[in-house]
């Protein structure tokens, strides 16, 4: 699968990412690096440990990485979760975590 095909599968905007990063090799390298990024794992661990502050940081980081890489679905869901966690007064409904998990899995599976 080409990097363009990957972005089509995940519903991302390859041209926008290429414009931001300037070189296809950089896009490819950062997408591959995402496969080993532990931010989503940290988010899940924070949720399991009932650590709202760490969950907020992980969701915010995931949102930023996803936005930079043009993972639009993951950006949208991570952004919604980040805003629900921002007050750091408790966890939102599980649907927010589930939505992030589904989009994360979709990117990883592609």
Name each model feature, range by range:
Residues 1-57, 61-110:
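Two-component system phosphorelay core
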